[in-house]
Amino acid sequence: MKPFRFSLKLALTAPLALALAACGGDAGGDLAGDVIAPIAAPDGTNWGETVTVSDADGYVLGNPDAPLKLIEYASHTCGACANFSATAKPGIQEYVATGVVSFEQRNLVRDPIDLTIATLVRCGAKENMQTLSDLAWQNLQETFNNVNANNAAYQAAGELPPEQRFIGIAQAAGLIDFFAARGLSADQQRACLADTTTIEGIANNSSSQANDLGIQATPTFLLNDRKLDVNSWSEIEPLLQRAGARQE
């Protein structure tokens, strides 16, 4: 799998039949450290509801200055990413609540549907981005079903002007109705999907970061900027504990 490069002449050729196949990282790394004491959130706040946008344009859940920073490079059309979302989030929330661990979600865009969803989950408040991503992963198979059922409309979207193209993709995939039922109005979505400058930024950030960090698969995880050779929560949690996110 190669990162998707944005083009105003993009061909809508997402490999839908293969999109649920698991992908994973291929580099190694481990960290070891002393126990890190919990870090209190500022008065009137809690880390589980704290979201910031990083310099890398990722969405960080938790303490932005957490000593342990877990980063996921994810695709919204990756079945393994959907599985991680379903199995890992309760555990991640527990670690984030301590202030010791933050969880940052970054995009590794692999196809036009992925880029469309990546745009839509960023369309509202930053606090909702990861939640909307999780909901989109839960709906992944239905999204593929919609595109396959509406393939003519999906392909026709590629011939639309740039500011209409991703609206066409979203309509063919059933995403406008899906996100409208989850708090993003249809007009709000269309405005975001017509913003080709923002869309190009998402795709270009994905491509440049993948090249700079040598990331070629999703999901890929970094812990304190060190690439991990695992991609499941059952493998990641022990690494967090070894790095200091554990009790005495």
PLM regions: where:
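C-terminal cap of thioredoxin/glutaredoxin-like
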Residues: 2-6, 24-40, 166-248
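Hydrophobic alpha-helical transmembrane segments of integral membrane proteins
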Residues: 11-12, 215
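Functionally engaged cysteine thiol sites
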Residues: 47, 123, 192
